[in-house]
Amino acid sequence: MKHIFMNMAVVGLFSLGLASCSDELNISSIDPQSKTTYDDMELLAKQYATLGLTGQAGPAGKPDISADEGETGFYRTTFNLQELCSDECIWAWQNDNDIPALTNISWTAASDRVNWAYQRLAYDITLFNQYLSETETREGDDYKKYRAEVRFLRALHYWYFLDLFHKAPFKLVYNPEVLPEEKAGVDLYNWLDQELTEIEPELAEVGAFNNKANFGRADRGAAYALHARLALNSEVYTDGQKKEYQKAIDYCDKILVDNAGKYELCREAKNGYSGYQQVFMGDNDYNEQAMKEIIFPIRQDGKKTEAYAGSTYLISSMRVSGMPYAGTSEMWSCNFARKALATRFLDIENNNEANNLAKMLSETKEYKKAYEAYTNGKTFANAGAASDPTKMTEAEVIAADEALGGSTKNIIRIANDERALLYAGVGGGFRTLTTDQISGFTNGLSVVKWQNSRSDNSTPSDGKFSDTDIPLFRLAEIYLTRAEAKYRLNGTQDLEDINELRNRAHATPVSAVNLAVLLNEWGKEFYMEGRRRSDLVRFEKFAGNKYIWDFKGGVSKGTSVDKHFNVYPIPSKDTSNNPNMHQNPKY
């Protein structure tokens, strides 16, 4: 991110002069307010910076929220509430604060991680309200667009409130003396629908910011994408009062038909990286093919946006020392794939190669037996490597993975799908497909979808913090949204939209559409992108007993959980301090 807009974001961060609002958050309702003065365009950039930064002094030192700063960023908090409770991943270290509550779907109104997400959303909205209040009298077309962009960011945050909590502490003005009101369900849905409709014509035209100078700003494409997502979930958000699937289709068509060609799927392989891989790499803000797919990103730069809550979190938490092609010096060994995610790609019941790989991964002793048979008679650079893969060099690990079948390349081949970016190799230790007891990072396969390496093979800007922008909205979502909305509206078999994505991944095209096919496709295309819980709720597969996955409900083989867990509780800190906010049922 060597561009003007991101440089401004960093300057704007400090121009605000905000002290941390943490003390106020701890003692009063979650409505952080501080007196500030604005410095024009830099402050617009600051509004965007809230998506990727966590405070005013790099990764730590002057946090926005009073907690572990790396844990309380916008994307990390919302990602955790969407993914750690789902069928996709497990946090290896179950003794960490509040982690079991997410793993097992057993959170309460006192859960810290629920509170952190709630605080972050409320804090950011206050900044947006402040900007809008102080620029209300500014004139000119530029300010009209700037204000529309900030209104979009505010709407995005209220969407997260609706999706996660089914209600929000709602306020549209900057006034420290007034507590937020509660707006829930259909009322919040209707407000979002109206707000997006109002700001769409005031935003820059579709694709206007899909260039290196302005990448990361919201144009109409971003608003249309959010509007389509809102409408697709209308039945859930309004408790069945609305089913606006035609509206979802219409907003997809505004991108795919009315503005055809403004965005394109990243298809062409480059230096051995598939088109799909390139969307999640460290140069996805320079690689024009990857940029073309991304409708709205969270900007990240290893030098200019140091934080532990953005793509650095996604990359570092999913790697352990010893894994090949790491692309980072930060390897935290935290998030690994649940069996349900691995078998989404590896059909162990019907594919002999997948079944054979699963047998080797069934127990550590089985993998070790195969490993020692491979290393027998070979010479290695370091003593002990013949029995302990953590003592291998990277080149030796790569060779062993190719021979034993645990490489990502081999998993892609077996899955017949380039989206199967999983690693079952020996880098960092012997992995298993699943476990009866969560004890460490190698209890499952590793997810290598997110990476800081670059498709042009150039060096990342920093060895510790990631350059990889986070595609918050990308064109693939529009294809799948339209396909699902058509099916839910009248049973239309929209094979073309689904197969656009499968063809890009060189996967076998589908020949029929049903809800199971649609959910499976969402899972293969968007795993570990911070949305899985939402999709499972929409398909009635999250709470209840219609779908059971490993460690759901705190049991290794999984069990049913009560349906009140489909939404998160309002943090007790807020219900205690704001009489306008009421707790969700059964919390």
Locate predicted features.
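Long, intrinsically disordered, low-complexity segments
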Residues: 20-27, 40, 121-122, 185, ...
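Membrane-proximal, proline-rich intrinsically disordered regions
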Residues: 21-75, 577-587
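Short, surface-exposed recognition loops and adjoining beta-strand edges that mediate ligand/DNA contacts
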Residues: 31-38, 58-82, 204-221, 236-322, ...
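Conserved, well-structured interaction surfaces
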Residues: 41, 45, 49-54, 89-165, ...
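Flexible, polar/acidic helix-loop-strand segments at domain edges
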Residues: 99-106, 116, 343-474
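Short coil/turn linking the two alpha-helices of tandem helical-hairpin repeats
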Residues: 162-164, 169, 207, 233-240, ...
